[in-house]
Amino acid sequence: MNRIGGVVAVAVLLVSGCGKKEPGAPSAKDAAPVSQVDRSFSTESLIRGVRLYQEYCAQCHGPEAQGHPDWQNPQVVAAPPLDGSGNAWKRKKQDLIAVIKNGASRQGEPVMPAWKDRLSDQDIDDIMTWFQALWPSDIYTRWRKDNAAGATPKG
C-alpha cells in the first residue's frame, strides 16, 4: 500500500503541473507545435485509477506504467509502456478503450487479456486518467487535440 500511496502522490504532483519528461522519450512537439490543453484530472479518478491499475495492469505494464524493457522486440510478447514513452498516445481514445475491454492478440495468440467482464466503463476511464497523468504535457496536449478533431495522433 505504501508504494501505491507514493504513486498517487506522484500522480497528484504531475496533475498540479510538475510533469516529468524522460530523456529520449518521443516528443509530440517534434511533429507539430501545439498549445497546451487543460490537464485538470479529478483527484478521485486518479486515486481509483492507480488502485485499479495496480490491481489489473501493473503485473504486465510495470508498477509505474514503464512497460517491459523488450516491448519493441517483435520476437517477445511484452507489454508496452503507458507512461507516454511508448505508442499508447498515438492511439485514438476509442481504440485504447477497445484494447482494454477486448484484449489484444498477435498472430491469433492472446497477448493481453480482455477486461470487459471485470472493469466498468468508469474503471477504464479512471485507469486511463491515471496513466495519462504520467504523459509529458506536449504528448497529452497533442493526443487531446487530435482526438477532439477525430484524427489519429501522429508522431
Q: PLM features: what roles do these ranges have?
A:
Residues N2-A9:
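Sec-dependent signal peptide recognition
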Residues K21-L52, G150-G155:
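Electrostatic cytochrome c docking/interface patches
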